[in-house]
């Protein structure tokens, strides 16, 4: 009997060792069973990405799905935070908006490229005259943000867009900017953002109260193109990468990550290699261009009370110097 128990114990130890080697030694990370059905869109790699040490969880599915978003929120703690980094008091808004979307898939069903090489394209004026368009278009995944245009700037920033992050005040409203091959991702910071999306999808009159500037009054994208970003991604950017406090002093406005840092965080979860373009700012000349498009100058950046640009620049400097990412617009 004793020998039988010893054999069972040794078998258990061996099984644990094998599983440990499979799941961790090859960097194919453990994922919760509730998410398994959504994992087939992220091809595992045999080597760790350079930035692996920055993340507590790996291969996290970044988009909310109507069928299980509450389970995912409970699993990763988003049910313990209010917007913008959770959904504790806004779950019904999320449910209604998600019910009108057609998909929460990450990549196209025919996209089976493993270990994706991605570029996150910021909107910085440093992209002017860099002629990086062809280089940018060569990546497996191209992530853009807000209303940074491609049309008319193809030589500088390329033509293709895989993902574009937006919020109601920053989304395109002119149909000439719609690429049917682009997936657009709502980053919700307040319940009004979800209500706005729901009203647009239902064809209702848009309530513009509660926005810091007038949001788009029409939606140029089809429901199949739209996703809602899991607040966990934004929370990771704020607390894990930028190390923002969870409670700010009463005399300070809370700081939130810019869309650019959120986009980089998204890339960390879905890509094996991440390159950046357009994330360098010229603070020494406040008259220098803020974006690669338009006439805005760097002086506007200093007036923004809701972002900690200094913390973000230090974070970018750190991950670039440590070769966790590659900067295409480094002078």
Curated annotation (Swiss-Prot):
Coiled coil: none annotated. Residues 1-4 are cytoplasmic. InterPro entries: Glyco_trans_29, Glycosyltransferase_29, GT29-like_sf, Sialyl_trans. Belongs to the glycosyltransferase 29 family. One of its GO terms (biological process) is oligosaccharide biosynthetic process. The keyword Cell inner membrane does not apply. One of its GO terms (cellular component) is extracellular exosome. It catalyses: a neolactoside nLc4Cer(d18:1(4E)) + CMP-N-acetyl-beta-neuraminate = a neolactoside IV(3)-alpha-NeuAc-nLc4Cer(d18:1(4E)) + CMP + H(+); a beta-D-galactosyl-(1->4)-N-acetyl-beta-D-glucosaminyl derivative + CMP-N-acetyl-beta-neuraminate = an N-acetyl-alpha-neuraminyl-(2->3)-beta-D-galactosyl-(1->4)-N-acetyl-beta-D-glucosaminyl derivative + CMP + H(+); a neolactoside nLc6Cer(d18:1(4E)) + CMP-N-acetyl-beta-neuraminate = a neolactoside VI(3)-alpha-NeuNAc-nLc6Cer(d18:1(4E)) + CMP + H(+). It comes from Homo sapiens (Human). Ubiquitous. This is Type 2 lactosamine alpha-2,3-sialyltransferase. One of its GO terms (molecular function) is N-acetyllactosaminide alpha-2,3-sialyltransferase activity. Transfers the sialyl residue from CMP-N-acetyl-beta-neuraminate to the terminal galactose residue on sugar chains of glycoproteins and glycolipids. It's alpha-2,3-sialyltransferase activity is specific toward type II glycan chains (Galbeta1-4GlcNAc) on glycoproteins and glycolipids such as neolactosides nLc4Cer and nLc6Cer, whose sialyl-products serve as precursors for the Lewis X antigen. Critically involved in the synthesis of functional selectin ligands needed for neutrophil recruitment during inflammation and lymphocyte homing to the lymph nodes. It is found in: Golgi apparatus membrane. Keywords: Glycoprotein, Glycosyltransferase, Golgi apparatus, Membrane, Signal-anchor, Transferase, Transmembrane, Transmembrane helix. The gene is ST3GAL6. The keyword Isomerase does not apply. Its EC number is 2.4.3.6. It comes from the Eukaryota. Residues 26-331 are lumenal. It is a single-pass type II membrane protein. Glycans are attached at residues 129, 181, 282, 295, 308, 327. The chain crosses the membrane at residues 5-25.
